[in-house]
Design a protein with these regions (language model features):
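Class I SAM-dependent methyltransferase SAM/SAH-binding core
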Residues: 56-101
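C-terminal lobe and adjacent flexible extensions of AdoMet/dcAdoMet transferase-like proteins
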Residues: 224-265
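A short acidic, Gly/Pro-enriched loop at the edge of an enzyme's catalytic core
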Residues: 103-110
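A short glycine-rich, Lys/Arg-flanked "PGG" loop and its adjoining helix->strand segment in the class I
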Residues: 127-139
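SAM-dependent methyltransferase
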Residues: 124, 144-232
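Residues lining the SAM
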Residues: 114-115
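Conserved class I S-adenosyl-L-methionine
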Residues: 1-42, 44-53
Length: 265
């Protein structure tokens, strides 16, 4: 079973240090355009974004005239979302809460769980999260879940990735365990010349960090195949369930980088 505390600590303490390195306002705008086109929402419709992080999708939804509630357990990320919303001139309702504890009931026309936000808990708790979203929707409401495609990532996950973040380099060391379907990553900060160039593979997990390299945190996520996620969703209680390979309507395939489940209550 995943070390749930480790994942919670990672997203509270480590993730806010570099989450903006994964920000793409243009992607968020196009993704929201596709989602809202599917949902066919009326002006003023209520939308749940959970977890919302620093609000890139929440803000795009609010720009389109929807009433947006964002839920996240990181107060740091919520503060960023508040600041970004003020700068964008939109209003968000933000709540600091674990998505496992959401108690909404029949309140939303659209609910979204985006950017690989499922899989950090036990399998039973992931099912609970999906139940929370079903309960939060009004009859006829739409749920959109977006995460990594296990069947693609097992064949393409690089042992190491690097990203530039505000003048320093983020190093990500990846490992996938096929026996448990878990993707573990070590996230490190590297300073100094040449930091952006990938180096040779590292040894064991307890090896000494290179000079100028600081371990920021470790994460672990359970990756699901499309049929596993579909079954966890309990499709019999939804009026329609569709599967895509991206938040642009790409058809799903083994080679699609994403699994996007779209379910109508």
């Amino acid at each position: 079973m995943a070390d749930v505390f480790q994942s919670e600590r990672f997203f509270r303490e480590a993730w806010p240090q570099f989450s903006r390195a994964f920000e793409s306002p243009s992607d968020a705008a196009s993704e929201v355009e596709w989602i809202t086109g599917l949902a066919a929402l009326a002006a003023g419709a209520r939308v749940l974004d959970a977890p919302c992080g620093f609000g890139r999708h929440s803000i795009e939804l609010a720009r389109r005239g929807f009433e947006v509630t964002g839920v996240d357990f990181s107060e740091t990320e919520l503060e960023r979302a508040r600041a970004a919303a003020r700068e964008a001139g939109v209003t968000l309702t933000l709540a600091c809460q674990d998505i496992r504890d959401m108690e909404f009931a029949g309140e939303f026309d659209l609910a979204v769980n985006l950017f690989s936000s499922i899989g950090y808990f036990s399998d039973d708790e992931d099912r609970l999260v999906l139940d929370r979203f079903w309960r939060a929707l009004k009859a006829g409401g739409l749920f959109v879940l977006d995460t990594r495609n296990r069947d693609q990532i097992v064949r393409s996950l690089p042992p190491e990735e690097r990203k530039r973040v505000n003048g320093w380099t983020l190093r990500i060391e990846n490992a996938f365990d096929p026996a448990t379907s878990r993707w573990r990553a070590r996230w490190s900060r590297i300073a100094g010349p040449g930091a952006a160039r990938p180096g040779p593979p590292r040894g064991g997990p307890d090896e000494k960090r290179a000079a100028g390299e600081q371990l920021i945190g470790e994460s672990e996520i359970r990756l699901y195949s499309a049929h596993e996620l579909s079954a966890m969703l309990r499709p019999e209680r939804w009026s329609r369930v569709e599967l895509y390979g991206g938040l642009d309507g790409t058809p799903f395939s083994l080679d699609a980088p994403r699994i996007v489940l779209v379910a109508r209550k």
